[in-house]
Curated annotation (Swiss-Prot):
GO terms for cellular component: autolysosome membrane; autophagosome membrane; cytoplasmic vesicle; endoplasmic reticulum exit site; Golgi apparatus; Golgi membrane; neuronal cell body; perikaryon. Keywords: Autophagy, Cell projection, Cytoplasmic vesicle, ER-Golgi transport, Golgi apparatus, GTP-binding, Hydrolase, Lipoprotein, Lysosome, Magnesium, Membrane, Metal-binding, Nucleotide-binding, Prenylation, Protein transport, Synapse, Transport. Disruption phenotype: Lethal from late second/early third instar larval stage. In the cortex of larval ventral nerve cords, disruption of axonal trafficking in motor neurons of presynaptic cargo, but not mitochondrial cargo. Aggregation of presynaptic active zone proteins (e.g. brp/Bruchpilot and Rbp/RIM-binding protein), synaptic vesicle proteins (e.g. unc-13, Syt1/Synaptotagmin 1 and Dap160/intersectin) and lysosomal cargos (e.g. Lamp1) in the soma of motor neurons. Synaptic vesicle proteins and presynaptic active zone proteins accumulate in closely apposed but separate compartments. It comes from Drosophila melanogaster (Fruit fly). GO terms for biological process: autophagosome-lysosome fusion; endoplasmic reticulum to Golgi vesicle-mediated transport; eye pigment granule organization; protein secretion; Rab protein signal transduction; regulation of glutamate receptor clustering; regulation of postsynapse organization; secretory granule-lysosome fusion. The keyword Transport applies. This is Ras-related protein Rab-2. It comes from the Eukaryota. NCBIfam families: small_GTP (TIGR00231). Belongs to the small GTPase superfamily. Rab family. Mg(2+) binds at residues 20, 38.
Length: 213
């Protein structure tokens, strides 16, 4: 299916925080309670609509183990968005966020949108990290924040789509160079610039209407 833009995402965070389950819930709308550990990198994709435009999200789900960290780093540079995930029932996964964030910012483009996600909100009785702590971390580091549940699908859709909206706004503001695919954005056949001052605004107009995802 044709699209106006393709956005590349990377999902990062400790092992067992629910990264693969979040991806599966978003792409397939199902929860798989027993999930094999990700070895290296897994992939998913889905079409969404923003501002009447078809956007394809290409999502790379990374392994949380230290042994695969070098592989994960190689995917940072080509990402427009990152979902940084911790488990609200495991304090250590929250404590490791600073390391993940430093890694992401060191190896990615400076404009990458980062969404902080506190996953497993359905397990509130086992919560070790208060929501206010997640909000404070996000404020301190300039991140978007949301709590989700891959099991119940709570806020999963919103987390992926709101990240895309942030990226789209940066495109409209001219922050992203959309001609440089290293920024994690690819122009599709539907691309029809609404702002003539945007980089790459000379592209041909695509179809205004298309099928739903």
């Amino acid at each position: 299916m044709s699209y106006a833009y393709l956005f590349k995402y990377i999902i990062i965070g400790d092992t067992g925080v629910g990264k693969s389950c979040l991806l599966l819930q978003f792409t397939d709308k199902r929860f798989q309670p027993v999930h094999d550990l990700t070895i290296g990198v897994e992939f998913g994709a889905r079409m969404i609509t923003i501002d009447g435009k078809q956007i394809k999200l290409q999502i790379w789900d990374t392994a949380g183990q230290e042994a695969f960290r070098s592989i994960t780093r190689s995917y940072y540079r080509g990402a427009a968005g990152a979902l940084l995930v911790y488990d609200i029932t495991r304090r250590e996964t929250f404590n490791h966020l600073t390391t993940w964030l430093e890694d992401a910012r060191q190896h990615s483009n400076s404009n990458m949108v980062i969404m902080l996600i506190g996953n497993k909100s359905d397990l509130d009785s086992r919560r070790e990290v208060k929501k206010e702590e997640g909000e404070a971390f996000a404020r301190e580091h300039g991140l978007v924040f949301m709590e989700t549940s891959a099991r119940t699908a709570a806020n999963v859709e919103e987390a992926f789509i709101n990240t895309a909206k942030e990226i789209y706004e940066k495109i409209q503001e001219g922050v992203f160079d959309i001609n440089n695919e290293a920024n994690g954005i690819k122009i599709g056949q539907q691309h029809s610039p609404t702002n003539p001052s945007l980089p790459g605004a000379g592209g041909a107009a695509g179809a205004a209407n298309s099928g739903c995802c």
